């Protein structure tokens, strides 16, 4: 798959503002190691819905691969249980030099060995020595407060995004 291009771009700011180009957040997300973030990660937050309808948010590390975002989660975490019941979710992130971006879409676990290997290589570049296992990853250590290994890899396919920064606000829609 190639990187998605918006099918619709809408300026949400003042009339005199111009729409923010999708290339601004895309270029940061697709960079091998984001500027000023040598580990490759920058603040990102996953928003899901609990079975009772209440919202849930948690910090995650994301990686861009082949047009989608990927993140890891243990099978018994609240986010994994929420996504099993309802894959609709958001990822919000503060990108270096803006704009701040919120993406809306769906997340599902991935078992494809080729994708696991490709994303595993990206994660290892950040210094986390993950190894691919059947359907996920393991490592000698994990995130603080997280489930022990193995961790599932989730693919987040976004359908819409909103970017907001000092120069205005823009909504992008994608046909995916």
Whereabouts are the PLM-identified features?
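Residues embedded in well-ordered secondary-structure elements
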Residues: 35, 51, 94-96, 145
């Amino acid at each position: 798959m190639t990187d998605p291009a918006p099918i619709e771009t809408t300026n949400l700011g003042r009339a005199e503002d111009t729409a923010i180009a999708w290339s601004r957040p895309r270029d940061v997300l697709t960079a091998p190691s984001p500027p000023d973030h040598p580990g490759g990660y920058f603040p990102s937050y996953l928003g899901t819905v609990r079975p009772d309808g209440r919202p849930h948010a948690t910090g995650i590390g994301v990686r861009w691969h082949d047009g989608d975002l990927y993140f890891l989660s243990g099978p018994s975490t609240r986010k994994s249980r929420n996504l099993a019941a309802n894959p609709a979710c958001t990822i919000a992130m503060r990108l270096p030099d803006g704009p701040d971006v919120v993406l809306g879409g769906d997340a599902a676990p991935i078992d494809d060995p080729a994708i696991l290997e490709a994303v595993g290589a990206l994660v290892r570049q950040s210094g986390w020595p993950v190894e691919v296992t059947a359907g996920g990853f393991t490592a000698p250590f994990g995130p603080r407060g997280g489930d022990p290994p193995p961790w599932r890899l989730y693919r987040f396919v976004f359908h819409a995004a909103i970017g907001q920064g000092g120069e205005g606000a823009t909504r992008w829609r994608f046909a995916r």
